[in-house]
Amino acid sequence: MPRILLIDDDDQLGPPLAAYFQRFELALTQALRPSEGLALLAQGGFDAAILDVMLPEMDGFELCRTLRKTSDIPVVMLTARGDVMDRVVGLELGADDYLP
């Protein structure tokens, strides 16, 4: 079963998203902090990552930049911020998609 890592500090988002993905035979793991997410990704075994933009420690843009230095895992930015420039920045930093 493909594994997806969600890095989002909203602990209410993970369970319903996990239930949704499970219908498509995808396993979701949530990290609430970027440092936790990077540690999990370093262990390997994930097929894709979903990043929030507004995170503690570092924002999702910096997290994407950091992740791209060591991994080519598909990255989707998922955020409530719908500004066009945010989308441009996310994609320029290496995100594969940006969903406002």
Residue ranges and their predicted role:
Residues 1-100:
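N-terminal/domain-start alpha-helical segments
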